[in-house]
Structures are given as structure tokens and as C-alpha cells.
Swiss-Prot record:
Pathway(s) served: Cofactor biosynthesis; molybdopterin biosynthesis
Residues involved in GTP binding: R33, K85, T113, K176, R274, L275, R276
Binding-site residues for [4Fe-4S] cluster 1, renumbered to this chain: C40, C44, C47
Cofactor: [4Fe-4S] cluster
Known role: Catalyzes the cyclization of GTP to (8S)-3',8-cyclo-7,8-dihydroguanosine 5'-triphosphate.
Originating organism: Methanosarcina acetivorans (strain ATCC 35395 / DSM 2834 / JCM 12185 / C2A)
GO terms under biological process: Mo-molybdopterin cofactor biosynthetic process
Residues binding [4Fe-4S] cluster 2: C269, C272, C286
MF GO annotations: 4 iron, 4 sulfur cluster binding; cyclic pyranopterin monophosphate synthase activity; GTP 3',8'-cyclase activity; GTP binding; metal ion binding; S-adenosyl-L-methionine binding
Catalysed reactions, as listed in the record: GTP + AH2 + S-adenosyl-L-methionine = (8S)-3',8-cyclo-7,8-dihydroguanosine 5'-triphosphate + 5'-deoxyadenosine + L-methionine + A + H(+)
Protein name: Probable GTP 3',8-cyclase
Family named by the database record: Belongs to the radical SAM superfamily. MoaA family.
Length: 334
């Protein structure tokens, strides 16, 4: 078991099955995805704000304190949560991010998803505070196209690339480049992105992400995911399958490529092991469901956090269910 914070020992006995959080569909919860801010310095055309309704997006007042964030993680770790991913908004907008990282219990992996703009100057301090690795959003290597997708001013792409270099140098690896595929915009850049990461020698992975079509205006940008999967398989010398969401990893000419397909994908839901936490302190059982949130800010003690955590897990339900209508995980996998 990895120990992120020197001198600390594991808080949770690995072998005690009764400690594991399991939802009504048999899925174990072993990870948290925590949004620590809604603030961001980009306005990406496809952004879903981590499923938030964003009535208070951009507001400092509603963000969780470091104490609450760490309290949530400590309680979750007692019940089998091994991995935590921090997101936003842009998590590096939190000047106290290092403070948050430093107070976490020992975990298998602590990661963050960032747009990379502020990463160059903080990569080393984030690593020292306990961050293991980062995902960096990079949808295009073309400055003009990057600006069109993200709303970023000229010169931003160069900052992101410097941030990636700094992350690799600091040991925040493997760095995963999140590339949301947009038909007719950047879907012709996959090979260029693969060549971009090749010099990093396996320390950077390309993660292709299917557009989440939650806005009718985005429908025209949806790619043919099955066709792309077929091409990737044909070109790959090796195909591996990750447990998380049953994702496929393709080794193509020595470069590692993942393809994340969340839309209309019952396999994605069947293997989902994460519980989300919104920036304003609510457990969110599913990214695409908005009426079953659990407000953890009401908790006045660790025991109350545990109670609300269990309530949120009990509300987890797969958004996409196989056409058979079978909803028990063990049946899905037969």
C-alpha cells in the first residue's frame, strides 16, 4: 500500500470486506472524484462543469474548506477508497491545494485534472505535498484551434506545454493528456498528438475522450466512436483492458493510447467505482443525474460524514443499463 505522507501508516485493513462500500448494484466504491472549485481560466466549448448545475459557479464562498475535503477523504479511506482525483473548474485556482494534499491519509493514488496553464510554477510543490500524477487537458496542438476550443488567449498553448514538461520533470507521472474528440475540429490530430508524446518515453499517455453529448448543439461534433475503436485495434500491437469503466488501452508504435467512452455505454457504468463530490460540498452518485445529491456540509462530525457517505452510495444507480434490463453487476459480466 502506497504511503503519500511520510510517517503515516495505513488507516484501513485491506482484508476486511465489511469495510468496503458497495452500491445496490454490486459495484464497489474505491475512488473519489472531488471538484474543489468551479472557477476556471478557460471556457471550453464542451465543458459540463463536472455535472454541476453551476448556479454558483465561479464563486469563492461556496467552496469546501480544506478541513471538510480532508475529512471526507479520511472517512472514505476507512471504507475502501484507495484513489482520489481532484478536479474543477481548474483545481490550481485553489491557492491552498498543497495544504489539502498534505492533510490527506495514505492512499494508493492521488491525482488531479488540470488545464495545465498554472502547472509550470507549482508542479514541484504539488508533488512534494503528496500529488502523484496529473491529467492535463490538451485538445489541439494548433494554437488557433486550441483557442477556438478553449476560449484561451494567444500564448496559452505554450504555457500548457511548459506545464506538461514541468509535471514530467517533477515526477507527476504518468501524465495523461485528455483530448476530447470533436468531429471536424480536432479529430484529425490524433496521430500528431501521438507523435507529440513519443519523446517523453512512456511518461505521457494519450487519453482520447468521447464528447459527452449533453447539449443538443454539440451533436454535430460527435465522432463515430465504434469506427475509431476499430481503427485503434487494427493499429495496436497490444490491447489491454483497465478495470475502471472497462477502458481499453492500445499500444501503437510504442505509444500508449486510452479511449474513454462514457456515452450510451453500459460497460462504462457497470465498472464505475467512483463517487463524485461537487465543489459546493455535495456527494454526487452519478455525473449525469442531478436529483439525488447528498449535502455533506451538514455533517458536524466524522460519524455524520460516514452516514452521508453511505447514503450517497446507496443512491448510486447505473445511468446506462444493458438492453436486457438486467441490473446486477454479476449478471452484466456473465
Amino acid at each position: 500500500m502506497k504511503n503519500n505522507n511520510s510517517g503515516k501508516t495505513s488507516l484501513y485493513p485491506e482484508e476486511k470486506e465489511e469495510k468496503i462500500l458497495v452500491d445496490p448494484y454490486g459495484r464497489k466504491v474505491t475512488g473519489l472524484r472531488i471538484s474543489i472549485t468551479d472557477r476556471c481560466n478557460l471556457s471550453c466549448m464542451y465543458c459540463h462543469n463536472e455535472g454541476a448545475d453551476c448556479c454558483s459557479c465561479g464563486s469563492l464562498g461556496h467552496e469546501m474548506s480544506p478541513e471538510l475535503i480532508c475529512g471526507i477523504v479520511r472517512e472514505a479511506a476507512k471504507f475502501g477508497v484507495r484513489k482520489v482525483k481532484f478536479s474543477g473548474g481548474e483545481p490550481l485556482f485553489r491557492k491552498d491545494f498543497e495544504e489539502i494534499l498534505a492533510c490527506l491519509p495514505p492512499l494508493k493514488e492521488v491525482s488531479a485534472t488540470t488545464n495545465g496553464i498554472l502547472l509550470e510554477k507549482r508542479a514541484k510543490t504539488l508533488k512534494a505535498a503528496g500529488l502523484d500524477r496529473v491529467n492535463v487537458s490538451l485538445d489541439s496542438l494548433n494554437p488557433e484551434k486550441y483557442g477556438k476550443i478553449t476560449g484561451a488567449p494567444p500564448g496559452t498553448l505554450e504555457k500548457v506545454i511548459k506545464g506538461i514538461d514541468s509535471a514530467v520533470e517533477a515526477g507527476l507521472t504518468p501524465v495523461k493528456l485528455n483530448m476530447v474528440l470533436l468531429k471536424g475540429v480536432n479529430d484529425n490530430e490524433i496521430d500528431a498528438m501521438m507523435e507529440f508524446i513519443r519523446p517523453y518515453g512512456g511518461k505521457v499517455i494519450l487519453q482520447l475522450i468521447e464528447l459527452m453529448n449533453i447539449d443538443p448543439q454539440l451533436s454535430k461534433y460527435m465522432i463515430d466512436s465504434k469506427a475509431l475503436e476499430k481503427i485503434l485495434e487494427e493499429r495496436a500491437s497490444e490491447v489491454r483492458v483497465r478495470h475502471l469503466h472497462h477502458r481499453k488501452k492500445y499500444i501503437i508504435d510504442g505509444v500508449e493510447v486510452e479511449f474513454v467512452r462514457p456515452m450510451d455505454n453500459s460497460e462504462f457504468c457497470a465498472h464505475c467505482s467512483r463517487l463524485r463530490v461537487t465543489a459546493d460540498g455535495k456527494f454526487k452518485p452519478c455525473l449525469l443525474v442531478h436529483d439525488n445529491l447528498v449535502d455533506v456540509r451538514e455533517a458536524k462530525s466524522p460519524k455524520e460524514i460516514e452516514k452521508l457517505l453511505r447514503l450517497a452510495v446507496s443512491r448510486r444507480k447505473p445511468y446506462y443499463i444493458p438492453a436486457t434490463g438486467v441490473t446486477k453487476l454479476e449478471k452484466w459480466q456473465e
